[in-house]
Amino acid sequence: MDIKAQLLQLKEEIKKEVQDIFDEKVLNEIKVKYLGKKGLITSVLKSLGSLSPEERKEVGQLANSIKEFLEEALKAKQEEIEKKKLEEILRKERLDISLPAEWFEPSASHPVLTTLKEITEIFKSMGFTVESGPEVEYEDYNFTMLNIPEHHPARDMQDTFYTSNGMLLRTHTSPVQIRSMLKKKPPIAIVAPGRVYRKDMDPTHSPMFHQIEGLMVDKNVSFKDLKGILKIFLENIFGKDIPIRFRPSYFPFTEPSAEVDVGCTVCKGKGCRVCKNTGWLEILGCGMVDPNVFKAVGIGPEDYTGFAFGLGIERIAMLRYQITDIRLLFTNDLRFNLQFRGIE
């Protein structure tokens, strides 16, 4: 039998064997049998050199067409096998959706996190970016570079949690402002939310609480800009009709400094136990960045001005949701937490 007849017979055998492929093992065996280094089709192609030029061309074309036919048939079988495997996996892993699902109690967003998220979004809408920093901080960043001198009462052991080697648990998020001014050039507009720590525990104070502080630095930034930003913020939090007042105050890192009050949200300014019969509630502290702070971070106070502000998140949450004891926010009592389901 000549080579051409052998190839045609080989093609018929291939058709029958391909039809009987049912798994990858058989498929690979057929691939090796015909297309391997010692495979039947490979052997035919290697023997073409012994043929005349006319026969070589005709037989070569036939051998290559059979090779292509086998490769396509094997590829189709491979896809068929993989499809069946996937169907089998899906059949075994199929879920009976008619079965009743396990009931999970709907969660409730914690009022502190809800308030923090809302405050952050308000400032982001005004062009501020959010920055963060370590909670274990250098004493220089927490105090010295913020114009808080060595013997200032805030540095006392009874007020601050010190660790070692000039490190402490930050008492405010102001160190994030220092870090931002050290790594960025003006203009700067940031807010820094996070946990802070102070040695204090009573119905209105906690040794750990959340703060958000803001900083804006640029040329010609004024106290008027500060008042405008805070007015927009407070109206978004408490409503457009909330009375707002600024009172002169003192902070080492701002000059001039002010504290901001809003009309009591409980008695609507008439006077009650919450506002100590003043009709006002203290909300935050603020002021223009002290030139000494700018000098500490390498920003020229003759070229740039800026303002800073800071407020306690728990304070805002307590006022908004009329919570009388800050310790309730940290008890993990579901009876308390689930009251706030749906407020987010």
From Swiss-Prot:
Catalytic class of the enzyme: ligase
CDD domains: PheRS_alpha_core (cd00496)
Catalytic activity: tRNA(Phe) + L-phenylalanine + ATP = L-phenylalanyl-tRNA(Phe) + AMP + diphosphate + H(+)
GO terms for MF: ATP binding; magnesium ion binding; phenylalanine-tRNA ligase activity; tRNA binding
Domain of life (superkingdom): Bacteria
Binding site for Mg(2+): E255
EC nos: 6.1.1.20
Cofactor(s) demanded: Mg(2+)
Main location: cytoplasm
GO biological process: phenylalanyl-tRNA aminoacylation
The keyword Zinc is annotated on this UniProt entry: no
UniProt-listed Pfam families: Phe_tRNA-synt_N, tRNA-synt_2d
InterPro entries cross-referenced by the UniProt entry: aa-tRNA-synth_II (IPR006195), aa-tRNA-synth_II/BPL/LPL (IPR045864), Phe-tRNA-synth_IIc_asu (IPR004529), Phe-tRNA_ligase_II_N (IPR004188), Phe_tRNA_ligase_alpha1_bac (IPR022911), Phenylalanyl-tRNA_Synthase (IPR002319), tRNA-bd_arm (IPR010978)
Entry GO CC: cytoplasm
Alphabetic keyword roster: Aminoacyl-tRNA synthetase, ATP-binding, Cytoplasm, Ligase, Magnesium, Metal-binding, Nucleotide-binding, Protein biosynthesis
Cofactor: binding comment: Binds 2 magnesium ions per tetramer.
Subcellular location(s) per record: Cytoplasm
Subunit-structure text: Tetramer of two alpha and two beta subunits.
Record-stated family: Belongs to the class-II aminoacyl-tRNA synthetase family. Phe-tRNA synthetase alpha subunit type 1 subfamily.
Entry protein name: Phenylalanine--tRNA ligase alpha subunit
Species of origin: Sulfurihydrogenibium sp. (strain YO3AOP1)
Taxonomic classification: Bacteria, Pseudomonadati, Aquificota, Aquificia, Aquificales
